[in-house]
Structure formats: C-alpha cells, structure tokens
Amino acid sequence: YTAGVIPSTQYPDNAYVAIYNGTNFNETPVIAKTDKIGYACGRMRSQYYQTIWAADNGDVYVFSPGYGRTAVSSSDLKKVTGQKPSGAMRIKAGATDFDPDYYVNFEEIGTKHPIFRCWHISEDYFLLQLYKKGAEDMINGGTSADVSELAVFKAEDQTIMPVTGLPADGKFGGEPYGEKGYAYMAVTVTTGEKPAFYKI
C-alpha cells in the first residue's frame, strides 16, 4: 500500500462497461454505467475472474457478485463499503447502454446465493458458481468461503436451475469446457476417488 493511493474502488455499487465500435482499442469507448449492481468481476485473492459474457444473440450480460460489501473502511485506506446484492444487468446487442427493463437479483431467486464465477454455455444459458452458504459467508469467509454450488441461469427468463447429482464433497477445478450446448466441469473430491468430468 502506497500512502495517498486508494487501493479500492470508491464506487462499489456501480458497474461500468466500455463499449468499443469495432476492434480498434485506440478509439474512445462509450461508457455504459448502472447503479443497479456493483462492479462486475469475480475474485479469488489477487486473481480477478471474468463476469461479462455475450449470449449467442449478441446480448451482453453483466454479472456482479456484490463484492463491494466485503470492503472494510479505515481512516488510512478510505475504502467505501458497498450495499448492492449479487445481480445481473443486460446490454442488448448493438446498444451502448444498459437495458433499463432488465435486472436480476440473485439473492432473491433460486437458492438466493451470490455468484462467485460464471460462464456462458450456449444461447442465453450461463453456468453459475455460487457461494453455497449465502452472502454472509461471502462477506465474512474470505477465501475460505464455500463456493461448491453450481446452477444454470437462463438469462432471458431470469430463472435459475440448481445443478444436482454432484458429489457432496465436490470441489471444482478451473474453468468448464463448453461444447454443443453442454458444459463439462472438472470435479475433485476428498474421499480418495479420482477426479472426474461432469456433463451439465
């Protein structure tokens, strides 16, 4: 930490997306902003995870774990603690701003748990890795929080389907592989069994 440098966002309850016209990153992008969700990224220690994905029709879905709530302020760091729950917003294909009619609060649907990571599977289906014990564990558990829950999110319908049939002590290794509408997730267990791929 360098004195005078703020080590965290001062806007934890806002999400910003830079939209470029074409493939030239030298151009000035249009910045889409929303205050319905917090900043969009997953995180484990110093590694940040992608949580912005496009559906097959070009609509872009922006997912937020609601990590602003984990920031603890102090007089020297001057962090800002967020309040927004885990959620998702949409930018329609070709648009340059968030869809005002689309908002999902993941802590009000399905198992009501915040997301840890997410991946596009096919069409408007996304695989979500969730905090199994809820928002309180995410906020207080840090890197020890239980993230062993999976669900499939159908974005257009705003519905979540829990993934069942996984080992009770299953942990997930890395990122899933997607092909032909299926996600293949590497799963490890603590019972001595060999790791295996599960088809979702």
Regions found by a protein language model. Give the residues of each.
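Repeated scaffold domains used in trafficking and secretory/extracellular systems
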Residues: 39-52, 107-121, 168-179
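Short coil/turn segments that connect the beta-strands within blades of beta-propeller domains
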Residues: 57-59, 123-125, 180-182
